Design a protein with these regions (language model features):
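Conserved lysine of the Walker
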Residues: 47
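Helicase C-terminal subdomain and adjacent C-terminal extension
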Residues: 484-514, 522-587, 594-597, 636-652
Length: 652
């Protein structure tokens, strides 16, 4: 790597904001001998351009010995970020490669067939006459032979050990703040009816937290998967369904072998946890947010030893990251707005802090253009939610009145909260401005909301990251709940039992900072963020030492706004001559609702004090979009001094 090339590799015709200083600091950090440079760059600083400059410093093939690594990888965990890179003319020399399922076959009778189910993977010995024109293999060949290959983090990790995508000189990871969590997610093994093709034929033992028993079961399951895969490989032709089964079996065998070998390795730093659901014939299990085991069959057999679907989770994925990331390059640049604590981040991902430098990029957006407003109405923990949610709904109406001609985003945190808020807002009579989404259509519903010129308000779930809502796409947002991790998750509970509360609050703060960056995307842009859950204010106090200076400045300026009195008709343009057309009544410049509000009306919950039955439109589309039911009712201790008071049952 030659860091002195960093300025000539900058792809834009000119610098803006702090980009030139950032490049200077990154160059100096690599020149000082650091193997890894963390770049903490806030929203709007042009991280992708900085990333391209670093990638361009990689050793070129013409200056390398045959054994030397050359070129660079650019990778990001977010598909939308990779889409943005692919569409950016300034980043045209980042050669994007995606997974096979993103490409379709070009054979005449297979135009709608994904490449991963095309004849070349269905038929043994198939010789494709147009492989040289296949969109997947064409993109792969280009990406593997050009100086910068761009891909998602999932694809990057899956190609570890590949002869096509070998070790390179430089690896750039964009949006790297969640690297440890992504690694834990990718390394997690789900064994249930959605992930094991012949699950119904299995007898699953009750593990009862016995890791050794889980390992023995996984060894046996890997053998069964291998036999089934070999049977499929022996066939001359496979159906698309059999192709999917074969590929899944191959993936599953790799996962199981990795778990068994890592567990048997006495030098491995990884701690493994095993969760098990009830079999389908046992006690009822609520519909979950993500695991694939709620409708599983415990398998044949009988007696009291039958168990249900298994989730096997790594606690410390350092070894996994070593193989999938750190062995893939010589030098690394990790970019994000929210790498909040260098030492903690390095510890999580298995890096030596002595070989890591942190470069801070200053924020260039005026703090007055990105205000935070305290409209807290109480706690949104499970035990307080039925009381607090109607108050937040009333407050949202008043915020809509404050922004009659501007689009807004509501961060609901869970589908249960989303549904309750949507029902209450419809009951209040402002449903004409409300949009929601479900799990299946979230991207389509988001794009439809972004495309409309109406001042609609979108109630979202888990959209705190990877959204670019510049300008009039969104002028205000409301955070309805502190985004604490779910304490019923065994991985979270294990860390909290070890006293890792700083990690817990830092993770929530990271999500809040990411959310705040959705609505202000340029120095002359502006947007307001309203905080409705009182636990958010407490979070700021607990995690203050991990705040970047530019976000601490926002928190220090936070006050309570003077919102209009509760009048739902005014929120939809039916009162006081307010029009729903864009331009009249809209706030056209940064600033705030003027100072304090005694909150006498928001404190009232005299109407619709429940979650609302909500017979309005949209209820059918939300019928399957409930949040995770959890595994019991671990409510807070009630003591305000206890960290548990604000966090139990956060996903419900």
């Amino acid at each position: 790597m030659n860091p002195d090339r960093i300025f000539e590799e900058f792809p834009a015709p000119s610098y803006r904001g702090n980009q030139k200083q950032a490049l200077r600091d990154i160059r100096d950090a690599f020149a000082a001998g650091n193997d890894v440079v963390l770049v903490r760059a806030p929203t709007g600083s042009g991280k992708s351009l900085l990333a391209r400059s670093v990638a361009g410093c990689a050793r070129p093939a013409g200056e390398a010995d045959p054994s030397d690594a050359t070129g660079a990888y650019y990778t990001t965990p977010q598909v939308s970020q990779l889409d943005d890179v692919a569409a950016d003319d300034l980043l045209a020399d980042l050669n994007v490669i995606r997974g096979k399922s993103n490409y379709t076959c070009i054979l005449p009778d297979e135009r709608n067939t994904p490449v991963n189910q095309a004849p070349c993977v269905r038929e043994r010995g198939y010789d494709c006459s147009v492989k040289h024109r296949c969109p997947y293999f064409s993109d792969r060949a280009i990406a593997s032979n050009r100086s910068i290959a761009a891909m998602t983090l999932a694809y990057f990790m899956q190609t570890a050990g590949s002869e096509v995508f070998r070790k390179r000189d430089v690896v750039v990871v964009d949006e790297a703040h969640g690297l440890a969590e992504w690694a834990e997610m990718y390394a997690t093994i789900q064994l249930g009816p959605r992930t094991v093709p012949f699950w119904d034929d299995l007898r699953v033992p009750a593990i009862d937290g016995d890791l050794e028993r889980a390992v023995r079961y996984c060894e046996n399951l890997a053998e069964k998967c291998t036999r089934r895969k070999d049977d499929l490989l022996a066939q001359e032709t496979l159906s698309p369904a059999e192709v999917r089964e074969r590929d899944r079996l191959q993936e599953l065998i790799g996962e199981l072998d990795w778990f068994v070998s890592d567990y048997r390795d006495p030098g491995s730093p990884t701690t493994w946890l095993v969760d098990q659901s009830e079999p389908s014939g046992g006690s009822s299990v609520g519909d979950g947010d993500g695991d694939g085991g709620v409708d599983g069959d415990g398998g044949g057999g009988g007696g009291d030893e039958d168990g249900g679907p298994l989730t096997i989770k790594p606690m410390s994925p350092e070894k996994y990251l070593q193989h999938t990331v750190w062995d893939r390059g010589n030098k690394f640049a990790l970019l994000s707005a929210t790498i909040l604590n260098k030492a903690a981040f390095c510890r999580q991902v298995g890096l030596d802090p002595d070989n890591v430098a942190l470069v801070d990029v200053g924020h260039t957006f005026p703090v007055e253009n990105r205000p935070l407003y305290d409209v807290t109405q109480g706690k949104m923990t499970y035990e307080h939610r039925s009381e607090t949610t109607p108050k937040i709904a009333r407050t949202i109406v008043r915020i809509m009145q404050e922004h009659p001609d501007e689009k807004g985003l509501i961060h609901a945190h869970s589908y249960d909260i989303q549904e309750r808020l949507a029902d209450l807002l419809r009951d209040f009579g402002v449903g004409d401005r409300i949009r929601t989404h479900d799990r299946d259509d979230r991207d389509a519903d988001l794009e439809a909301w972004k495309a409309t010129d109406d001042p609609d308000v979108f109630i979202s779930v888990k959209m705190e990251e990877a959204l670019d809502l510049k300008g009039d796409l969104c002028r205000f947002q409301v955070l309805c709940k502190a985004p604490f991790l779910n304490t019923s998750d065994s991985r979270v509970a294990h860390r909290l039992e070890e006293g890792q509360w700083a990690w817990y609050y830092r993770t929530a703060l990271r999500t809040v900072i990411q959310a705040c960056g959705r609505v202000v995307r340029a120095p002359d842009d502006y947007g307001a963020t309203y905080l409705a859950d009182s636990s958010l204010v407490d979070l700021f106090e607990r995690a203050r030492t991990d705040m970047p200076d530019w976000f601490a400045a926002q928190v220090d300026r936070m006050d309570r706004p003077d919102l209009p009195e509760f009048e739902p008709r005014a929120a939809v343009g039916d009162s006081s001559g307010v029009s729903r057309g864009r331009g009249t009544g809209a706030r056209s410049s940064p600033g705030s609702p003027s100072r304090r509000d005694d909150d006498s009306t928001t404190a009232s919950s005299n109407s619709n004090s429940g979650s609302g039955s909500g017979s309005g439109s949209g209820s059918a589309s939300r019928s399957h979009s409930r949040s995770r039911s959890g595994s019991g009712s671990r409510s807070g201790t009630g003591s305000k001094s206890s960290p548990l008071a604000d966090v139990w049952d956060t996903e419900r």
